[in-house]
Amino acid sequence: MCTGGCARCLGGTLIPLAVFGLLANILLFFPGGKVVNDKSHLSDEVWYFGGILGSGVLMIFPALVFLGLQNNDCCGCCGNEGCGKRFAMFTSTLFAVIGFLGAGYSFIVSAVSINKGPKCFMANGTWGYPFHDGDYLKDQALWSECEEPRDVVPWNLTLFSILLVIGGIQMVLCAIQVINGLLGTLCGDCQCCGCCGGDGPV
């Protein structure tokens, strides 16, 4: 597969992942599927916008750049080899790095939140974090320490786990595009197939 075709494939995969990341982060603002009257009762990590910024917005731009490579024919700008493919592939590499950093941010925020557990109303009548060092992950009986919002533990655990997986996949895809983009920049893309009268690598 040509490096441009590979980039387009990666871009098409990143778009739905970014959308799912956005949705997962938005749902975290409704712990247990309920509206919270006091925003301070939400877990701190929800406000870090890992899914909205990291896996969402910062991933949309690289994905669009990767998909935009389909507008560059493999001869550059209609036979002008000086503009087009190599520069486009180099630019996609820079955006892939941005995407990797965004996905990494979302991945780290999600991992920290999963280990920390959700903020909830505890038996002592205060709001806080009843779990320590991910102990609730091994002992589901501890989940009862969170009295409100109801089902906040599985809610946060599920959504942050989704963000963790999405962030991990996005990091891998962006890393692949960094390598792919460098290959496209240094070695050129596919052989031209008669487009604009050209016949050779760009």
Swiss-Prot record:
UniProt-listed Pfam families: L6_membrane
Stretches that traverse the bilayer: 10-30, 49-69, 94-114, 159-179
Glycan-bearing residues: 156
Compartment(s): Membrane
Cytoplasmic topology ranges: 1-9, 70-93, 180-202
Protein name (database record): Transmembrane 4 L6 family member 4
Function statement: Regulates the adhesive and proliferative status of intestinal epithelial cells. Can mediate density-dependent cell proliferation.
Membrane topology: Multi-pass membrane protein
Entry-linked InterPro entries: L6_membrane
Homology family: Belongs to the L6 tetraspanin family.
Membrane-side (Extracellular) residue stretches: 31-48, 115-158
GO cellular component, one term: membrane
